[in-house]
Amino acid sequence: MSDIIRIGNCSGFYGDRLAAAREMVEGGGIDVLSGDYLAELTMAILHNQRETRGSHLGYVGTFLKQVREVAASCRKRNIKIVSNAGGLNPKGMAEAIEKILAELGVNSLVAYIDGDDLVGDIAKLQSKGEAFMSTEKQIPLCESGHKVVTANTYFGGWAIKEALDRGADIVICPRVTDAAVVIGPAAWKFKWARDDYDALAGALVAGHIIECGAQCCGGNYAFFEEVPSYRNVGYPIAEIKADGSFTITKHSGTGGLVSVGTVTAQLLYEISTPEYYNPDVIAHFDSIKIEQAGDDRVRISGCKGSSPPPTHKVCINTIGPCKQTVEVLLTGLDIEKKAEIYLDSIFHNLGGREQFDDIDIQLIRSDKEDPVANEEAHAALRLTVTSNDSHKLGRLFQAKITELGLANIPGNTSRGATGNDGSPVLVYWPALIDSKHVSELVHLGANLIEVLPTQRLDFNHVYYENAPVEIDKIPIAEVATIAFGRLFGTRSGDKGGCANCGVWARTDAAYSFLYYFLTVDQLKKLLPDMRKFDIERYELPNMRALNFYIHDVLGDGASSSHRIDRQAKSLGEYLRAKIIEVPQVLIEELGVEV
C-alpha cells in the first residue's frame, strides 16, 4: 500500500475548464479526483437556477459532463471522485450521475450527503436560541427584514470519510467547506482519528491550497513573468502523507508553475487570522514550513492543529431590496463639473433623490491629460440606486436616463446597465450555529448513516499557540522609489462583505522592511479609498507575509456589491501599482529594475 494519497483538483469555481477532469485523470496517477464548485456567490446562482429552471436543479450541471468523460476511466483505475457540485440538491445530482453510469455501463457506487439545508428549520432553531447573528453586521437574522431563500451549514470531511469507508466510488457533497473534499479522503486513507489534529490540519492546508484549481499553479500570480507558459495551465495535486505533511505538484507537460511563491499566494487567499477555522480542526497557518522540493514540487510540513470551534458556519442568502446600476462615460475637460450636472439632471428627471433608499456614486477617473486616443479621454460615472419599491427601477429608470441623451453635457456616452438591473438582489448573511444542532447524513444505496461532528463527541480540548517571533529591523540608509509590486507579491479575494489582501516578501530583508513599513495606517495612505473601512493586520513570519482583512468593503457580498470588482480579486494588484520609498539595498538584493 502506498504511503501517500494523491488528490487531484479539477475545478476551482463553477465555470472552470471543462476538460480539466479528463486531463487530471489521464495525465498521470492520482487516487482521488476532487473539485470545488461552490463560492459564496455560487449558492445564489444555484438558487436562481432552481427558481427559473425547476426545483429538480440547483446543482452544478457542468460537473455531469465531466463525470460522463471520466467515469469509466476512474472506475478502471480505482480513482475515487469527491465533489461539492451537489450544491443545493446533492440528491438530484446523485440521481443524474447514476443515470449517466447506467448509460455508460459503469458499475460505480454513488453516495450523496445532505442535512446541511436549514431553510425549513430556521424558525425552530431560532426558538431554541439560535439568533443566526451576522458575523459581519453583528445583528440577528430576525432583524434583517429579509426573506431567507437558502441556508446551508458548512460540513466538514467526516461524512465523506464514512461514505468512502462503506465503499462509495463517487461522493456528491452539498455545502461542505472547500477543504473538506481533501480532508475526507485523507482521513479515509490513513484512518485518522477525530483528534489527530495536526494531521487533519495538514490536510486542511492542502485542501485550501488546491481548492482554487490552477490558481496555485501560477494562475493569477503576482510575479506572472516567472511562469514559463500560461497555455494549458496544470491543475494541482496534493500528495499527502500519514502525518499530514504533503507536496503540491501538477502533471508534467502542463503549463503554469508550482513554486514557493505560487503556493504562498494561494495560502494567503481569502483568509483572515492565522487560525484557519474548519468544522473538523483549526489549522495554524503561522506554524507551517514551505520549501521547494524540485521542479514544480513544493513541500509543506509542520502544520499544527487545534480542536475545532464549537460552532459551524452557515451560508444564508436572503432576498434583499431592488438595485440598479448604470454607467455613463464622461469625456474630456471638466469631468467633475460634468458629473455634477449629469447627476443633478438624472435625479431631477427621476423625481428626486429622496425616493431611493440608498444611492452610491462612483466617479472613476480613467481619463488622461492630453490623451492620445479617444478612449483615453473617458472617465466612468457609475451610479447604483437601491429601493424596496421595484416600480421605481427597471425599464422606467433606464428610460429616464436615456431621455437625457440629447439634452445634457457634451461627450457623454452610456454603457447602459452594468450589473444590477432593478431586480431584487440576494444578500449574503454569514452566521454561526451551535454544532450541537448539526448532523451529516450519508445516503448510500438503501442505507442512511448519520455522522455526528467532532464537537458532539467526547474529546479533550486542544489548542496550539505559536510563540511570538521577533522581526529585526533593516537598517535604512540610501532609499529609492519603486512600485510596491516590484518587490512584494499580493493575493486578494472576498470573504462575504469583507475582503482580504495578503502580501508577501521574497527575502528576509524584504520582509523586515515590509513588517515595519506596511501598517494599517500606511495601507490606508497608499489606498485612500480604503480609509473609511476597519482593517485588521495579521502577521505570518513563517511565510514572510502579512494579511489585511478589510471589513464591509464589499457591502452585503458579491451578489449585491456596488463595486466593479465584486470579489476584490484586483485589490492586491492595485496595491502593487503604488509607488513607495524603499532601502536601495533591497532593490539591489532582488536585482529589480527601478
Q: What is the role of each PLM region?
A:
Residues 102-118, 183-224, 228, 516, ...:
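Catalytic or ion-translocation cores adjacent to nucleophile or general acid/base/metal-coordination motifs
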Residues 84-89, 168-185, 490-507:
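Conserved phosphate/anionic-ligand binding catalytic regions in large, soluble enzymes, centered on
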Residues 270-298, 458-488:
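Short, Gly/Pro- and small/polar-rich lid/capping loops
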Residues 533-594:
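Helix-rich interaction surfaces within compact, conserved domain-sized segments
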Residues 302-482, 495, 504-511, 516, ...:
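C-terminal non-catalytic interaction/assembly regions of soluble proteins
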Residues 1-23:
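N-terminal amphipathic/basic leader segments beginning at the initiator methionine
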Residues 200-302, 323:
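A conserved active-site cap/scaffold subdomain adjacent to cofactor or substrate pockets
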Residues 2-4, 40-56, 75, 117-146:
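Gly-rich Lys/Arg/Thr-decorated short loops/hinges at beta-loop-alpha junctions or inter-strand turns
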